[in-house]
Amino acid sequence: MPRISEIAASVGLLLLIGVISVDGLVKEGDYQNSLYQQNLESNSATGATASFPFLMPNVSPQTPDLYLCTPIKVDPTTTYYIVGFNPNATMNTAHHMLLYGCGEPGTSKTTWNCGEMNRASQEESASPCGPHSNSQIVYAWARDAQKLNLPEGVGFKVGKNSPIKYLVLQVHYAHIDKFKDGSTDDSGVFLDYTEEPRKKLAGTLLLGTDGQIPAMKTEHLETACEVNEQKVLHPFAYRVHTHGLGKVVSGYRVRTNSDGEQEWLQLGKRDPLTPQMFYNTSNTDPIIEGDKIAVRCTMQSTRHRTTKIGPTNEDEMCNFYLMYYVDHGETLNMKFCFSQGAPYYFWSNPDSGLHNIPHIEASTL
């Protein structure tokens, strides 16, 4: 099995410090919106759900495939529960967006390029989250995905009693033609939140790979990790992400039965070039200690060159986001599950610990 590593999917954005105050998520300075402030203050008093606009501060990217980041600092005196995500973006502007939960942001600057996967860039860059700061993915969006509401009673805990002290928004601007005339962008997400405690805490596990796809061939990029924590996960939503070569992305819970045979329960399977929103999982059966979570991306190349995993449209990605909740206690310490990918790691490797693999099902819709 591959080691768990905190490899964040390629990242980037311009940064704007804001504050989630005891009266609600209110940004400081010129970006503060009095209407939002009024709504948040009144809703906070009643314990109802309020909405906070976490948006790019009218940025104008001038470099193709630029990743920009912007943060908000969560009020450390109050615990909040995020219960919904309403994107404010279109695929004509933003290739994708990620929302990170961090102990500290990747830099003390108010704005930065967070595209650290882009080795070709000469610009100074930093990760979305600081080192050893409990980096985790909370939410992801691409290809005109619609609003996501969490199940009743479920929420992402941030603030006082959570390791998430900052939220960092990342936007990947793949194409910048529309900004050449000085136009600006405020892509982002409206966060629905409440101070009313949620017993069911939400978490997101990001599974993905490194690797490469040979020219003019179909390749499988695969990963799998074992749950080694005494927790019961209730999966409820999943999201897939590739670039242009992705054909099918599938995810499974793998459990060994009393006869020693592995049973593969499908969690989700999609064409990654359809709207990359969070969909209901195929099954909601619990995931327990000792289970494995396995993901395959079936990639088909018509290019006359090798395509590597990387941040740009000329590269590829293989990502599967699994959203779950726990009934008791905290969410998984494991936030990421990555492998080396092809040509080094495959489910069928003798040391993977996997057998009874549904090869055909995992690669067909």
UniProtKB/Swiss-Prot annotation:
Tissues and organs where the protein is expressed, per its UniProt entry: Expressed in the central nervous system (CNS) in a small number of CNS neurons (approximately a few hundred). Expression is present both in cell bodies and within neuropil regions. It is strongly expressed in neuroendocrine neurons (at protein level).
Origin: domain of life: Eukaryota
Chief location bin: secreted
Residues that bind Cu cation A: H95, H96, H172
GO MF, one example: peptidylglycine monooxygenase activity
SUPFAM superfamilies: PHM/PNGase F
Reaction catalysed by this enzyme: a [peptide]-C-terminal glycine + 2 L-ascorbate + O2 = a [peptide]-C-terminal (2S)-2-hydroxyglycine + 2 monodehydro-L-ascorbate radical + H2O
Keywords: Copper, Disulfide bond, Glycoprotein, Metal-binding, Monooxygenase, Oxidoreductase, Secreted, Signal
Biological process according to GO: memory; peptide metabolic process; regulation of imaginal disc-derived wing size; response to fungus; sexual reproduction
GO cellular component, one term: extracellular region
Sequence positions that bind Cu cation B: H241, H243, M317
UniProt entry tagged with the keyword Oxidoreductase: yes
Induction, as annotated: Transcriptionally regulated by DIMM.
Disulfide bond annotation, renumbered to this chain: C69-C114, C102-C129, C297-C318
Signal sequence residues: 1-24
Cofactor: Cu(2+)
Gene disruption phenotype: Death as late embryos with morphological defects that resemble those of animals with mutations in genes of the ecdysone-inducible regulatory circuit. Amidated peptides are largely absent but peptide precursors, a nonamidated neuropeptide, nonpeptide transmitters, and other peptide biosynthetic enzymes are detected.
Subcellular localization(s) per the UniProt record: Secreted
EC number: 1.14.17.3
Activity across pH: Optimum pH is 5.0.
Broad class of enzyme this protein falls into: oxidoreductase
Cofactor binding description: Binds 2 copper ions per subunit.
Stored PROSITE patterns: CU2_MONOOXYGENASE_2 (PS00085)
Function: Monooxygenase that catalyzes an essential reaction in C-terminal alpha-amidation of peptides. Produces an unstable peptidyl(2-hydroxyglycine) intermediate. C-terminal amidation of peptides is required for normal developmental transitions and for biosynthesis of secretory peptides throughout the life.
Similarity comment: family membership: Belongs to the copper type II ascorbate-dependent monooxygenase family.
Protein name (database record): Peptidylglycine alpha-hydroxylating monooxygenase
